[in-house]
Amino acid sequence: MQYEDENGVNEPSRRRLLKGIGALALAGSCPVAHAQKTQSAPGTLSPDARNEKQPFYGEHQAGILTPQQAAMMLVAFDVLASDKADLERLFRLLTQRFAFLTQGGAAPETPNPRLPPLDSGILGGYIAPDNLTITLSVGHSLFDERFGLAPQMPKKLQKMTRFPNDSLDAALCHGDVLLQICANTQDTVIHALRDIIKHTPDLLSVRWKREGFISDHAARSKGKETPINLLGFKDGTANPDSQNAKLMQKVVWVTADQQEPAWTIGGSYQAVRLIQFRVEFWDRTPLKEQQTIFGRDKQTGAPLGMLHEHDVPDYASDPEGKVIALDSHIRLANPRTAESESSLMLRRGYSYSLGVTNSGQLDMGLLFVCYQHDLEKGFLTVQKRLNGEALEEYVKPIGGGYFFALPGVKDANDYLGSALLRV
């Protein structure tokens, strides 16, 4: 394991190596033009979740306010594009692939069996939308000297540095771009990733990948049921209402009054943290201690001393923390003061399970993702309040990064990142 230092790893040499590999892959791939001949879609398809779809065009990207789907993947890439024109080609191509994959259609037929197939085939002859969303974000490193974009970097975007409890693996950190791919089923998520990689061999190289999940019944509730994390507690109870457009404008979206570059309006700062849980240790911890650490009842999700999950804790009547400890997770994360109102963020986390670590412990945890209009006021402020909390004994952040989720695609003539690249 290579640990991340404050200055990061040597990126230019890595990119030069990957560009050579990508060029070889492109030389052996099939031209996209061969996809003109396609199979006909089946005449009937059972009216189930496979036909569910999210709008692709709009002011904002899907996958941020969208109710959480059951399956999720985070994939960070190094960009191999050599100049700004190449980067535009990449963003146009990604937009085309996202538009097709999220809306569904017939899988392309391979015109010559001696050539590689144009589709992986894992979804069969018809690619159902399956509630797929693909959200594109850009990292701090995309605004280096390669594309001349430095003056247009979002003002609060920065490289993720280590917090006191972090044990960051350099191989699991950062990225020029990040895809958050979500759908009702895992095979749709995997199909989307393979399609994107197949179409961009000379433009993208995978840097790191993690797959996550929430329970099917939580996903089917469309946000009405809070997912439970692998520590056994509800995760996201205190989220602001994503259906409240006025509130989301205040919490999630960058707006014109923030003195950000004009192209960022309608986008959102994204914080990603890969957090490993010490589940064996946690499972041997008394229930009372677990609940004290979180500040919530494990079964109901209610704040301690209250009855219902969404009851608002009354910290003013508990100044000494006799009911909800002063260092409990919920009290530190959101002390519910006038000052903490500005640090609200929209969480969209998923559990992960990867097997076992080198020490023989279960490799399980949380893919923490949150969106906010200001990274410093949102995630960074909250995380600083959480430094030293009792929960740190059971969790260990090992990777992730800070990104900016691009504004949406207006129509079929537009593409992701167009306002950025046209400056």
UniProtKB/Swiss-Prot annotation:
<dbReference type="Pfam" id="PF04261">
    <property type="entry name" value="Dyp_perox_N"/>
</dbReference>
<comment type="similarity">
    <text>Belongs to the DyP-type peroxidase family. EfeB subfamily.</text>
</comment>
<feature type="signal peptide" description="Tat-type signal">
    <location>
        <begin position="1"/>
        <end position="35"/>
    </location>
</feature>
<feature type="binding site">
    <location>
        <begin position="236"/>
        <end position="238"/>
    </location>
    <ligand>
        <name>heme b</name>
    </ligand>
</feature>
<dbReference type="GO" id="GO:0004601">
    <property type="term" value="F:peroxidase activity"/>
</dbReference>
<dbReference type="Pfam" id="PF20628">
    <property type="entry name" value="Dyp_perox_C"/>
</dbReference>
<keyword id="KW-0560">Oxidoreductase</keyword>
<dbReference type="GO" id="GO:0046872">
    <property type="term" value="F:metal ion binding"/>
</dbReference>
<dbReference type="InterPro" id="IPR011008">
    <property type="entry name" value="Dimeric_a/b-barrel"/>
</dbReference>
<dbReference type="InterPro" id="IPR048327">
    <property type="entry name" value="Dyp_perox_N"/>
</dbReference>
<comment type="function">
    <text>Involved in the recovery of exogenous heme iron. Extracts iron from heme while preserving the protoporphyrin ring intact.</text>
</comment>
<dbReference type="InterPro" id="IPR006311">
    <property type="entry name" value="TAT_signal"/>
</dbReference>
<keyword id="KW-0574">Periplasm</keyword>
<keyword id="KW-0732">Signal</keyword>
<feature type="binding site">
    <location>
        <position position="347"/>
    </location>
    <ligand>
        <name>heme b</name>
    </ligand>
</feature>
<protein>
    <recommendedName>
        <fullName>Deferrochelatase</fullName>
        <ecNumber>4.98.1.1</ecNumber>
        <ecNumber>1.11.1.-</ecNumber>
    </recommendedName>
</protein>
<keyword id="KW-0408">Iron</keyword>
<dbReference type="InterPro" id="IPR006313">
    <property type="entry name" value="EfeB/EfeN"/>
</dbReference>
<dbReference type="GO" id="GO:0042597">
    <property type="term" value="C:periplasmic space"/>
</dbReference>
<feature type="binding site" description="proximal binding residue">
    <location>
        <position position="329"/>
    </location>
    <ligand>
        <name>heme b</name>
    </ligand>
</feature>
<dbReference type="GO" id="GO:0033212">
    <property type="term" value="P:iron import into cell"/>
</dbReference>
<keyword id="KW-0349">Heme</keyword>
<dbReference type="InterPro" id="IPR006314">
    <property type="entry name" value="Dyp_peroxidase"/>
</dbReference>
<feature type="binding site">
    <location>
        <begin position="334"/>
        <end position="336"/>
    </location>
    <ligand>
        <name>heme b</name>
    </ligand>
</feature>
<dbReference type="GO" id="GO:0020037">
    <property type="term" value="F:heme binding"/>
</dbReference>
<dbReference type="GO" id="GO:0005829">
    <property type="term" value="C:cytosol"/>
</dbReference>
<keyword id="KW-0575">Peroxidase</keyword>
<keyword id="KW-0456">Lyase</keyword>
<dbReference type="GO" id="GO:0004325">
    <property type="term" value="F:ferrochelatase activity"/>
</dbReference>
<dbReference type="InterPro" id="IPR048328">
    <property type="entry name" value="Dyp_perox_C"/>
</dbReference>
<comment type="subunit">
    <text>Homodimer. Part of a ferrous iron transporter composed of EfeU, EfeO and EfeB.</text>
</comment>
<keyword id="KW-0479">Metal-binding</keyword>
